[in-house]
Amino acid sequence: MFTRTDGSYVFARWGRPICPVVFGVQEETLVIMKSAIEAVCIAAGHRTDELDPELGSNLMMFFFSDWEELRAVPDLDQMIPQLDNVVDRLVAAQANQYRAFRFDDQGAIQACFVFLRVDEALQQLGADSLALSQAVQAMFLWSQEAFKNRSPLVVLDNGTTVMRPEIAALLRAGYDPVMPARANDASHTLRLAARIEVAQ
């Protein structure tokens, strides 16, 4: 879940409360997004807040219909280095989402920028599923392959969408206070597994 495509192991979690802001959605969707983020934080043992003392908002989510729109967002190139090159790659890949992270001096997540091009695939998810999925994916620096073939969510028999139990357990283990906020050694997975086993 945390092994990069180049074979390196990189784990990072938030080192501060998450202060979200969402752009490009209607009020009812905004409420759903923020509720999902709060729910995932509670499940992980982390917390949200209204304002980050340094950044104001530290989890910024942008919804739009075309990657080209990003080039016109004021000062976005200051948050996303080489913005034009990033947009070019996303357009070429026909991607529908992109996440960029910033880290503090300890290597913990300091900020996360989420960009969602709302195509047919994302529209079919529905607001609740999309919100929950994006909240989960913003909690760690997941590998590029983590959810490529399997969603972090599962639909129950009653139609409710929830986190897969193993993902919820991984969040709780990763945010355990005794665990590091940053790890670059694959042995970290053994510590995560041990925390999950103890919790069960």
Task: Describe each region flagged by the PLM.
Residues 12-23:
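Acidic/histidine-rich, surface-exposed loop or edge segments in extracytoplasmic proteins
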Residues 15-17, 56, 109-111:
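Extracytoplasmic
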Residues 32-46:
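Short, non-transmembrane amphipathic alpha-helical segments
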Residues 67-133:
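Surface-exposed short loop/turn segments
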